[in-house]
Structure formats: C-alpha cells, structure tokens
From Swiss-Prot:
Catalytic reaction list: tRNA(Glu) + L-glutamate + ATP = L-glutamyl-tRNA(Glu) + AMP + diphosphate
Family to which this protein belongs: Belongs to the class-I aminoacyl-tRNA synthetase family. Glutamate--tRNA ligase type 1 subfamily.
Organism from which the protein derives: Clostridium perfringens (strain ATCC 13124 / DSM 756 / JCM 1290 / NCIMB 6125 / NCTC 8237 / Type A)
EC top class, as a word: ligase
Keyword list, A-Z: Aminoacyl-tRNA synthetase, ATP-binding, Cytoplasm, Ligase, Nucleotide-binding, Protein biosynthesis
Lineage: Bacteria, Bacillati, Bacillota, Clostridia, Eubacteriales
Name recorded for this polypeptide: Glutamate--tRNA ligase
UniProt keyword annotation of Flavoprotein present: no
Pfam families in alphabetical order: Anticodon_2 (PF19269), tRNA-synt_1c (PF00749)
Stated role: Catalyzes the attachment of glutamate to tRNA(Glu) in a two-step reaction: glutamate is first activated by ATP to form Glu-AMP and then transferred to the acceptor end of tRNA(Glu).
Keyword Lyase: no
Motif mapping: 'KMSKS' region: 293-297
Subunit structure: Monomer.
GO cellular component, one term: cytosol
Stored PANTHER family: GLUTAMATE--TRNA LIGASE (PTHR43311), GLUTAMATE--TRNA LIGASE, MITOCHONDRIAL-RELATED (PTHR43311:SF2)
Length: 552
C-alpha cells in the first residue's frame, strides 16, 4: 500500500490509468503493411535541410505503404522554444511536397483522433503512466541535487567508471516509500527515475532497418522520466507517444542510436511492443579532402531558407534528397524521365549506412534536369513567384512582357537535347537580361564577350556588313544562308575542312561572324539559339542593338 500512497502523493489529481489511454487510442484500422510514421521536431529554431531529409524519408515510407504520416511537436524544453517555429515547420514541409495526414496544423490547431499532438499538452498522459510505474515499484523519486550529481560524476570519471545514476550510485533507488513520502512532504525537490532492470553481463541485440543488426550493453542507468518541472524527458515521452499514437516505425538521426538500449528497455518496462527503428546517416559535406558534418553555423546550405533565396524549385531539392536516400533513384529517373517522383519506392535497406554526402554541384545538375523538363508556363510561374520576393526589378520587367518571356523560357527546349540553362532562379537574370533594354543599356564595351579570334573593331565591321543583309522575315535556313554570304564576302570560311587545310587564306570561320552578331545583340558569347533570340526580339529591337554596338 505504501507504493500506492507514494504514487497518490506525487500525482493526487491523476485518476486515469494506462488502460484508459490504450482504449482511448486504439490500434489503427489500416491495411496490412501500412506504416505509421511521424516527423517530431522540437520548436527550438527554424527548419534545416537535415529536417527536410528526415521528414521526406518518413513521408515516403508512410504514403507509399498506404499509411499515415503525422506531425508531433516535442516541446517539453519550453525555455528554448522559438516563436513561429511550428508554423515554419508546417510551411516548409508543405513547400517541399509533404503534407501531414494528422497532427499539428498551426500554432494552436491540430487534427486527428490521437490528439493532443503537442507534448506540452500531454502531461497528464505521461503522469498516468508514471503513476502506474510508481505503484508497481518500477520508478522512484530521486532527491539528488545538481551539486551531488556533479560531484558523483567527477568521482566516477576520476575512478574511470561509467558516469551516471545506476547500481550502487543510485542513492535513492532503494529508499522506502515511507521515507520518500516524508521527504516530499518536507518540501524536498525531486525528479522521477525509472528503475533499470539492466544486467551488466548482458547485451541488447536489435535490428536497425538501415544498419542491420546492432548490439549494445544493456542500459544500467536509472534514467530520469519526469523532470523537476513535471514534464517528461525525451526518452519517456517518445516511448509513451509512439505507443499511444500507434507509430510502427521510428526513423531518426543516427545520433539517437546510442539511446536505443534505453528506449527498448522502456518499452519492456512499460509492457508494450516497441516500434521498428531506422537510424539515418548524418548529412556530411567535403571540406578539403575530408568529410565533416553539415554545420548550421558554417554552411549556409544547411538552412532551408538558402534554397528559397537562391531559387531552387522544391522538386529539385526533393529529387536531390531522393538521390541521397537511395542511389538507385538516379538510374530510375534516367529510365523514367517523365514519371512523378512519388512513383519511386524508397527502400531503407538500400540506404547508405555511412554519412550521406551533400554536394551542391550535384544538386545543381539535378535541378537543371528538373527545370529543363518544365513547360515554359510553369517556369514563368515559378520564376515570377520567386522574383516577386527576391528580385523585384526582374519581377516587374518579366511580368510586363509575359508572352515574350514564355517564348524565352521555351528556347531550345523542344529538341532531343533541351538546353539546361538554369539550376536556380537567381541565375535567370544573367541569362536573359539582354531581352530588356533597361538592363542591357547598363553594360559597357568592357562587358561585351567576343569570340576569341575577334577584336571589337573587326566585330563592328561584321555588323556593318550584316546589318545591310539582315532580313527579319526569313526562316532559319534562309537566315543562316544569308549569314554565310556575309561571312564569305568578309573573308570568313563556311567549310571547316577548307579552313583547317588553309587557315591562312581566311580571317576565321562563319561561327566568328555569328559570334559577332550574338555579341552585338546580347553582349554574351554563350546564349541559346541566335535565330530564335532575334525572332523574339523583333526586327526593330535587333536593328537598334546593331546601332548601339556600332557606337561602342
């Protein structure tokens, strides 16, 4: 009866039992094989790419199995909570194509039958389970002060012992309920610890869905399950929440792998089945010749805001992350160039066991592939949405010429080898600025990129001759024939074999003449198809550009 008295003293207002909550949150009625997974961040900051990576794995595994993907907020450390972090999480995941079937929907809203989905609102649930453990003598109040714990830790380290509260060092583990009651009634502060049933001679062996079989010594620590503020520790909240929310698989960062013995032991003490576990590799990057963890402090690309500011389409980031999750995705994408990425089946056992390498060069390659497949109308919409927030001048210019810009975004896109000009929207300005006099006219002669074989004065002689022969109203073949005629008149070869045989007889190739025209119209040496650019610009604009070039 003493354990009962102790439990009632600590939790006088808790009248629910674990059985009540098991009935309230029954097993989910899902088809066989359907997985229930969650994204469970702490609202202590804004989202980073590692969070998107983890969330994408959970979302894909849930939805490709016909299961449930939910959002739980782990806000038991309320001192570190950042205002707006929850809304940022929801918005970020939505922007990256991940919507939650249930869970938190806003700072103060949620949906789903397994609510509440905020840990800070589940305090009575945790207390009911702790009260039950106290009744059974499986948990106890610990009155050790922070000073005592620090002194114990220093002593253990000095004696080369594992630090912590366990075995002979668990000072209050065997305190009688009567003595504990006296201390509580005297006003002493305490936390509640779970009595570890661990055996120092035994190991716990578990199957990790990424790493395979893992083995650890059994947990011996009497871990804290309720802190001094009455809220649970991460360990205990995880065990209760994932049990009651009927989570089937816990996918989390490998930094939690060392906690697995604690968590498996908690499920055992609670008398419930543990979920399956997978510990995903830490995202790494190359730093010189070595790898290191992607850093929030050192690496701007660790922040989700980086991808918005640079203008990566969300699909590009998703497809790149799928490449990291399963290297086979790249081959699948090559074989299924037009398929929706949702059609690809993520498989944990094919995931790299070591650190996932994050490579911006590879991301850019993936993003170019994604953008080049987009319809011009889609590119226009996505680009203007980005420019409205990050490049107001370009937004005003592009939206003032919507029809023209859709033509621009379609240049060289319909052939067997479509151009891949952009990896992200902040590259668009430099690639299309010459369609706008407002930007083009800011350039000087120093900005003009000529073919290496041409000086500016020779390029001007070419433009003087070509301007007279130029006819806007011709098809592409006729246009090129006219260009070649001008080239021949000026002493340029139109046959590469003849030029290579006797280069001294020519000033250069017809490509140099085309390069001069390109430079006059765009100031750039590398652009999409020149004829198409001229047709989009229109005759008046082309002739005006020739005039400006001759005046440089």
């Amino acid at each position: 009866m003493s354990y009962e008295n102790l439990a009632n003293l600590i939790f006088p207002n808790i009248d629910k039992t674990p059985e009540y909550y098991f009935e309230k949150y029954p097993k989910r009625d899902l088809k066989e094989g359907a997985k229930v997974l969650r994204y469970a961040p702490s609202p202590t900051g804004f989202q980073h790419i590692g969070g998107v990576f983890a969330s994408l794995i959970n979302e894909r595994l849930a939805h490709q199995s016909g299961g449930i993907f939910y959002l739980r907020i782990e806000d038991t450390d309320q001192k570190r909570e950042v205002e707006g972090a929850i809304d940022d999480t929801i918005k970020t995941m939505h922007n990256f194509g991940m919507d939650f079937d249930e869970g938190i929907t806003g700072e103060n809203s949620e949906k789903g039958a397994y609510a509440p989905y905020k840990q800070s609102q589940r305090a009575d649930i945790y207390r009911a389970f702790v009260k039950d453990l106290l009744r059974k003598g499986l948990a106890y109040p610990c009155f050790m002060t922070s000073e005592e714990l620090e002194a114990l830790r220093e002593k253990q380290i000095a004696e080369k012992l594992t630090p912590g509260c366990y075995g002979e060092f668990a000072k209050y583990r065997d305190l009688s309920p009567e003595e504990a009651i006296k201390r509580i009634e005297a006003g002493e502060s305490y936390v509640i610890r779970m009595k570890s049933p661990g055996n120092p001679e035994k190991r716990v062996v578990a199957h990790d869905m990424i790493k395979g079989e893992v083995s650890f010594p059994e947990n011996l620590q009497d871990v804290v399950i309720i802190k001094g503020d009455g809220l649970p520790t991460y360990h205990f909240a995880h065990a209760i929440d994932d049990t009651l929310m009927r989570t089937t698989h816990v996918i989390r960062g490998e930094e939690w792998l060392s906690s697995l013995p604690i968590h498996l032991q908690m499920f055992e003490v609670l008398g419930v089945e543990a979920p399956k576990y997978a510990h995903i590799p830490t995202i790494m990057k190359m730093d010189g010749s070595s790898k290191r963890k992607l850093s929030k402090r050192k690496d701007p690309e660790s922040a989700v805001s980086y991808y918005s500011e640079k203008g990566y389409p969300s699909q590009s980031v998703i497809e790149y992350l799928l490449n990291i999750i399963n290297s086979a995705f790249e081959e699948w994408r090559a074989e299924n160039p037009d398929a929706d990425y949702h059609d690809y089946k993520v498989e944990l056992d094919k995931m790299s066991k070591s650190g996932a390498l994050f490579d911006l060069v590879k991301l850019n390659d993936v993003s170019k592939d994604v953008i080049c497949k987009m319809k011009p109308e889609v590119v226009y919409d996505l680009y203007t949405n980005w420019a409205k927030e990050y490049d107001k001048e370009m937004y005003d210019l592009v939206t003032s010429k919507e029809a023209m810009m859709k033509e621009v975004f379609n240049i060289d896109k319909e052939g067997p080898k479509p151009r891949k000009d952009f990896a992200k929207w902040d590259e668009v300005r430099e690639k299309i600025f010459y369609f706008f006099d407002e930007l083009f006219d800011k350039e000087t002669a120093n900005d003009v990129e000529l073919p290496k074989t041409l000086e500016l004065e020779e390029a001007k002689r070419i433009i003087e001759a070509y301007e007279k022969a130029y006819n806007f109203n011709t098809d592409k073949d006729t246009w090129f024939s006219d260009l070649k005629e001008v080239a021949v008149e000026l002493g340029y070869a139109t046959d590469r074999k003849k030029y290579k045989k006797n280069p001294e007889e020519y000033k250069g190739m017809v490509s140099d003449v085309a390069g001069a025209v390109r430079a006059a119209l765009t100031h750039r040496a590398n652009t999409p198809d020149l004829y198409t650019i001229m047709q989009i610009m229109g005759e008046e604009a082309v002739r005006e550009r020739f005039k400006k070039f001759l005046s440089l």
